Curated annotation (Swiss-Prot):
GO molecular-function terms, A-Z: ATP binding; double-stranded RNA binding; L-threonylcarbamoyladenylate synthase; tRNA binding
InterPro entries found in the cross-reference section: DHBP_synth_RibB-like_a/b_dom, Sua5-like_dom, TC-AMP_synthase, TC-AMP_synthase_SUA5
Membership in a protein family: Belongs to the SUA5 family. TsaC subfamily.
Role this protein plays: Required for the formation of a threonylcarbamoyl group on adenosine at position 37 (t(6)A37) in tRNAs that read codons beginning with adenine. Catalyzes the conversion of L-threonine, HCO(3)(-)/CO(2) and ATP to give threonylcarbamoyl-AMP (TC-AMP) as the acyladenylate intermediate, with the release of diphosphate.
Segments forming domain YrdC-like: 3-187
Reaction(s) catalysed by this chain's protein: L-threonine + hydrogencarbonate + ATP = L-threonylcarbamoyladenylate + diphosphate + H2O
Protein name: Threonylcarbamoyl-AMP synthase
Organism: Riesia pediculicola (strain USDA)
Gene Ontology CC annotations of this record: cytoplasm
Amino acid sequence: MKNSELLKIIWALKNGEIIAYPAESVFSLGCDPDNDKTIQKLLTLKNRSWEKGFILVSDNYDKLTKYIDDKKLTKFQKRIISFHDTFFPRTWVVPAKKCVSKLITGQFKSIAIRISRFEYIKNICLNYGKPIISTSANISNDAPCRTKNEVAKKFNQCVRTMNGKTLGNFQHSIVQDLLNGYLYRKR
């Protein structure tokens, strides 16, 4: 990943733009989780209901504490969140702080989070200094984009797209409730 390209992605996030970037299985769309105006643009772009909420990805646990009600988590549960597996990513559903935008949590009192070591996500979050929203690069109910060219065809000039390749995983991350173990999405 070129440093100049990463700087353009960080600039886009700081200036309220939607970005597209390679993730573990598909290209993802993302934005600043503290910018409701941009989150609303993302919902519109994807034709997605706000009620579903979004996943936040980060390179480490500490950056997520602004959004997680971690007083409801044990030390062991916090360690579980911090474990990351690049090839088999897991998204955790955890209690959200009351101040988190409903555009992120949707109709829930919880928030979906994932810590990633995947090069592109890790570098974006490390250099941006906070987590970003992560949602598959697609219109709701359509197949997700797997390449930069597919993103360009589907979203034209609506997003700033990062060069790179996904890991090629054919399955999305497992989504699991950390408190009760419920699996929302399996492999």
